[in-house]
C-alpha cells in the first residue's frame, strides 16, 4: 500500500506548506512568559532529557509562538546532527485518534454511521462477544453489544494489553496490533477474544480507535490512509501528514534517545520509513506542528478552518474549509462518561472523555491549568496538544521522548497559561 505522501511528492507539494496566521509582537500573550517557555524547553534539552522539541501556540486567530529547540536526533560522535526545525516530522501516535474520530463524526452527519449501532453491524467478527471474569477464570455473555459510541469513548470492553492477565496474554498471542496486520486482520484477531469488562460500564484506554478505523474502511470501501487524505489532509492542506515518510523527506524525521535518559529503558519507536500494512487509527500518523495546527484550527473553529491559502496565508484567496457542523464539534468535545468508573491513571483527575479527546469537566480538580471545556490528548512518543475554546487558544508540543510524556503533559499547559 502506498504512503499518502507519495502522490504529493510526485506533484512537488512538498515545496508548499500552508502558513498559519502570524502576529507581530507585542502579542495578546505575555512575551516574557513565551520566552520563558522556550527557555524551559531548552533547559530540558541541555539537561539531556529531550533531544529537541517544537512548540506552537495559537491564540485569538494568530500563531503567537512556533519555535524549535535542540536537535532532531540524539547527538552523535559519527556525524553532525541537524538542529530541530519548526517543520520537523514527528510520530504523533495517539494524537491520530482525534483525527480518526473526526471522520466518524463526518460519516455520522452524512447519515452513513450511527453511534448507537453495534460494532458487529459493521464488523461481524464482533458478534456474540463474551466478557472474561479474572476472579473465576470464566466468561459470560455481554449484557449489551458494544456500540460505535463505545469505540469512540473507550467503553467497549477492549484493552491495550499493557498489563499482565489472561486477556492481555490472549491479545499478545493473537498479535493484536502487529504492524504486519491490516485493519481487517486486526478485526479477525481481536473480535473473538474476550472483553475485559461489560460494554458501557467502564472507561479503559484501548484498541477501540483501531477498531473504529476498520469500521471507517468498511463504510468507505477504501484504506484508512486514503480516507484521511481525501476527507481531512487534502481539504486542510496537511501535506506533511500520513502513515509513512518518503525517502526524500526522512532527513526531517525526529528520533528519540535509544534509551530513556532517566531510567535506561529502551525506547524503540515505530518504523515510519516505509508504508505500513497496519494503518492504525489509534496511533500511526506522522505529522508536523503546522499540519496538526491546521486540524486544531478546524476544531477550535467548530468545524470550519481558514482555507490553506486563507486570509493570512500565501495568497489570501483561500475560502474557508468546513468539514463539520459546529453542533457536531460541540458534541464530540463534550464529556461522554458522566459518572462511569475509569480504569488506570491515563485519564487525569478533573477530566472526562469525549469522542476521541479528554475533556476538562471543571476549572479546578486537575493538577494543570485549564478552563472547563478545554480538551486535549497526547501521543506515546512524546507529543501533546490542548484546545481551550474559552480562551480561543490551542497549543501543541512535539518531542520524541516517550519517557518524559507525563511530565511534559503537566509542564506544558502551565507554561502556556502563564502567558495569558
Task: List PLM regions with ranges.
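Short, surface-exposed beta-strand/loop micro-motifs that present aromatic residues
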Residues: 374, 381-390
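Generic C-terminus detector
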Residues: 401-420
Amino acid at each position: 500500500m502506498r504512503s499518502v505522501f507519495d502522490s504529493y511528492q510526485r506533484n512537488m507539494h512538498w515545496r508548499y506548506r500552508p502558513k498559519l496566521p502570524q502576529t507581530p509582537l507585542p502579542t495578546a500573550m505575555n512575551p516574557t512568559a513565551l520566552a520563558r517557555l522556550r527557555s524551559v524547553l531548552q533547559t530540558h534539552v541541555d539537561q539531556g532529557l529531550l533531544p529537541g522539541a517544537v512548540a506552537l501556540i495559537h491564540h485569538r486567530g494568530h500563531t503567537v509562538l512556533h519555535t524549535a529547540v535542540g536537535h532532531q536526533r540524539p547527538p552523535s560522535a559519527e556525524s553532525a546532527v541537524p538542529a530541530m526545525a519548526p517543520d520537523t516530522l514527528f510520530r504523533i501516535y495517539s494524537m491520530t485518534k482525534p483525527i480518526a474520530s473526526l471522520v466518524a463524526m463526518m460519516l455520522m452527519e452524512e447519515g452513513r454511521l450511527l453511534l448507537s449501532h453495534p460494532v458487529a453491524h459493521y464488523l461481524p467478527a464482533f458478534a456474540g462477544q463474551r466478557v472474561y471474569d479474572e476472579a473465576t477464570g470464566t466468561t459470560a455473555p455481554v449484557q449489551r453489544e458494544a456500540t460505535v459510541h463505545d469505540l469512540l469513548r473507550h467503553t467497549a470492553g477492549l484493552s491495550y494489553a499493557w498489563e499482565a492477565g489472561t486477556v492481555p496474554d490472549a491479545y499478545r498471542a493473537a498479535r493484536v496490533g502487529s504492524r504486519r496486520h491490516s485493519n481487517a486482520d486486526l478485526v479477525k484477531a481481536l473480535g473473538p477474544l474476550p472483553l475485559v469488562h461489560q460494554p458501557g460500564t467502564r472507561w479503559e484506554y484501548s484498541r477501540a480507535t483501531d477498531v473504529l478505523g476498520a469500521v471507517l474502511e468498511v463504510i468507505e470501501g477504501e484504506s484508512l490512509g486514503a480516507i484521511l487524505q481525501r476527507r481531512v489532509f487534502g481539504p486542510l492542506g496537511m501535506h506533511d501528514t500520513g502513515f509513512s515518510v518518503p525517502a526524500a523527506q526522512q532527513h526531517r524525521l525526529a528520533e528519540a534517545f535509544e534509551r530513556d535518559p532517566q531510567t535506561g529503558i529502551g525506547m524503540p519507536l515505530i518504523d515510519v520509513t516505509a508504508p505500513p500494512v497496519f494503518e492504525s487509527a489509534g496511533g500511526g500518523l506522522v505529522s508536523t506542528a503546522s499540519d496538526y495546527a491546521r486540524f486544531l484550527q478546524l476544531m477550535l473553529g467548530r468545524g470550519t478552518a481558514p482555507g490553506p491559502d486563507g486570509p493570512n496565508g500565501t495568497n489570501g484567496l483561500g475560502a474557508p474549509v468546513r468539514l463539520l457542523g459546529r453542533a457536531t464539534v460541540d458534541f464530540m468535545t463534550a464529556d461522554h462518561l458522566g459518572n462511569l468508573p475509569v480504569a488506570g491513571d491515563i485519564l487525569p483527575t478533573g477530566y472526562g472523555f469525549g469522542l476521541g479527546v479528554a475533556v476538562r469537566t471543571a476549572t479546578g480538580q486537575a493538577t494543570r491549568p485549564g478552563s472547563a471545556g478545554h480538551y486535549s490528548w497526547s501521543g506515546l512518543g512524546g507529543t501533546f496538544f490542548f484546545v481551550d475554546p474559552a480562551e480561543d487558544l490551542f497549543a501543541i508540543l512535539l518531542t520524541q521522548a516517550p519517557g518524559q510524556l507525563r511530565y511534559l503533559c503537566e509542564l506544558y499547559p502551565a507554561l502556556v497559561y502563564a502567558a495569558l
